[in-house]
Amino acid sequence: FISNKYATKDHLIYEICNEPNNCLEKNNPEKPWECTKDTSVTWEMIAEYANRVIPVIHYEYEAVGAQHPVVIVGTPQWDQLVDACLKEGMCQGNGKDLCDSLPERDARLKFDNIMYAFHFYPGEHHEGFEKDGKKDYYNMYSYIYDVLGRLPVFCSEFGLTNPDGDGPIFIDRTDKWLLLLSGNNAGKQLVSFCNWSFSDNERASSALNPGACAAKNWNDVTVSGDYIKRVLSVVNKGVNDTTVLKESNLYTK
């Protein structure tokens, strides 16, 4: 329906298969977002879906003589195993040290204008650290740094918080992520991003304070909203301004 109705519009981006997962149970009170029981969604499952949906989108655009639109395709484990199409098997834990041990392959989608989705929340996705004598998180920075040298990526969701959209605000960790997405990676990619979320609910990830929408007070921003507003003011200075954080911490006061 959407591709049929808007095939003549050249400003649409499609995202299919958002955050593929098969989470059956969440019962960790310390990490309410964490899936404690699941059956993994593999790249093969996602690719089968994409190979059915993308031709339908393309058909509508070709019918009106339009160029194929950009289609962002979800990746396994909530859009975090971004290079699953280049690896045999699944590496659990989102870690470069784990994924590097898997054999290489090329199972990329055979369409033009395809990008691969990546989501991050700095409360859980960062450089990794030891907890209680064992590795609790893996080095996602290092992993995505390398992936950006191999695949076109769109960060279609990120927040400044924990993955449930709440909890502390992690300014420094988010700075580091946006620096990486701003060309400071193996492929020198300038990665487009979308922030979660433009809303006025009580979660820490909301850009606006409760009641701001009803009052149409778009300056009533939260800590997260103030940060994103300043980020966009930097990014929107002009297409030649790709320095972002390379020389100074432009995103923080």
Give the positions of each predicted feature:
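Aromatic- and carboxylate-lined catalytic core of secreted/periplasmic carbohydrate-active enzymes
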Residues: 222-253
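Extracellular glycoside hydrolase catalytic/binding regions
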Residues: 3-13, 17-191, 200, 206-233
